[in-house]
Amino acid sequence: MRPGIRTATLLLFALVTISTAHAQAHTTDSRPLQLSVFGGPTGVFTGLAGGRNLSFTAGVDLGFGTYRGLLPMAEIRGTEPFDDGNVDAQKNALGGLRVVKRLRSIHPYGDVLYGRGEIEYQGVGYLNPAGNIYYQKTNSNIFSFGGGIDLDISPALSIKFDGQVQSYKVPVTVSGELYAKPITLGVVYSFGFGQRHAF
């Protein structure tokens, strides 16, 4: 894992841990169940030989309460390409932790996700560094770190700007890894279990 990603991940988990510990020792805001779904087109820079995909990402977020103005949520999401590009096509399913800070109608967040992914190499396949095997498909565990902003346009709807860095283990690079960078522009629908609040 790259040092920058490792540091940011540790900071995110530390933030959640500190907030939770504080909440256990003090009276905190209590909020109703938070459930939202999101989806939208995703441009993926695959990290392999300039490869690009045009994909669709969809997911669900579930939170149970806020701590000192932070909303920890469980998230699951999946990405499926509909334009595979000329190098490789990446799809994955991920789950993990998302932490949101609600600032009136603007909601920045960070997330740490883990899951499985599949890469299909276009044409006859992709040659390994040793030059003796063409790979047509590989599967890998994925670590994903990223964040974004949700902008409210109504009580139930928001526009999502999301970016991730995703680490795949692959046999077709010298390092044995590649780092994909998906960027999503999507729509969020929040279910009405209670009104949103600004902190």
PLM regions: where:
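Bacterial N-terminal signal peptides that target proteins for export
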Residues: 1-9
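Outer-membrane beta-barrel proteins
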Residues: 46-50, 81-87, 119-123, 170-174, ...
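Gram-negative (and chloroplast) outer-membrane scaffold detector with strong preference
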Residues: 56-129, 140, 184-191
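Bacterial N-terminal signal peptides
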Residues: 8-18
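Predominantly the C-terminal beta-signal and adjacent terminal strand-loop region
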Residues: 153-199
